[in-house]
Amino acid sequence: LEFRRVLFRSAEQNMKHRILVINPGSTSTKIAVFEGKEKLFDTTLRYSTEELASFGWVMEQVDFRRATIEKALADNNIDPDSLDAICARGGQVPYCAAGTYRVDQAMVDFMYTRRQGAHASNLGCVLALLLAKPLGIPAYIVDPVMVDEMDDVARVSGLPELPRKMQGHALNCRAMAIRCADEVLHKPLADCRLIVLHLGGGGSCRLFVDGRMVDCVRDDEWMFAPERFGGAAIQDVVTLCYSGKYTESEMMGFVRGKGGLVAHLGTSNAIEVEKRIEEGDSHAKLVYDGMLYSNVRAIGALAAAADGKIDRIILTGGLAHSKYVAAYITKKVSFIAPVEVMAGEFEL
């Protein structure tokens, strides 16, 4: 499968094209219409558990989500014929460099082969092409979750069969890196050295050197998160896998969904956990601080990989809204570089 990476000329970048942006998540689809850099309209289309329960797997939701998008555009007086292009969140495509890619039928067909661990982001390119084709306009994806620009030396693990690979929150991390370079450092991303820590239900940490994501700590490596196990000593993990206590499916559930705060405290809600800490729950504090400590270690490791030369450390994702989280991490890592809190997501 080959992808066509799109390089836009500077003149094209300055033109005011009208673009529909689609960001499918597990229980919602965020959409927005931009004209140049101006956002004309945005909304989040939320779906109930009952609405999604009838679908066997995520790719069966295509027609349902397409109809909700078309209705939202009509309800907000957005004429589809006024659009110049459609751009979507990129899903689990083969590993690729960061950038913008033209969606074609081959990419769409590939999404239907990703049954194991299929993610809602896989719907993005499918929806984009379905909506774009009748209009005669192009469809694109940007910075899919499989962006991998890792340096060769960083790929080497202690087992030849298991080279390290980059995966995670590429879209939001790169968007925040670009914003920080532009608005804070006032220089191109290509001239920056940044560490971006994404803090959400899952987390990942990425190192940017000269504009490239050259290394990362994934959400299934050793930093844990509200819904992610992260990692432990491999010997202990292997022993647990073969203990007969858990099935493969249950173990994979700990990796994403039932690990982290969920496993320790029975909830992934950070607001609830912080409330328990305020009320004197010492166990909740130990676990919560342990999670943040694991994130701090990831930042430190990537800083060392960059010879300690870092312009900014960026905290992003929903959990970065927490003053507790920002204060804990900033206190630990500000000796490396100034910390920029850019909470939330910038994925539209």
Where are these regions (language model features)?
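Short glycine-rich, Thr/Ser-proximal phosphate-binding strand/loop in the N-terminal lobe
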Residues: 19-60, 219
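N-terminal phosphate-binding loop and adjacent alpha-helix
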Residues: 43-81, 107, 111-116
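Glycine-rich beta-strand-to-loop/alpha-helix junction loops that act as flexible
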Residues: 89-91, 199-201, 312-322
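Glycine-rich phosphate-binding loop plus the immediately following alpha-helix
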Residues: 123-130, 141, 156, 161-193, ...
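Adenine-nucleotide phosphate-binding core of ATP-dependent small-molecule kinases
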Residues: 253-308
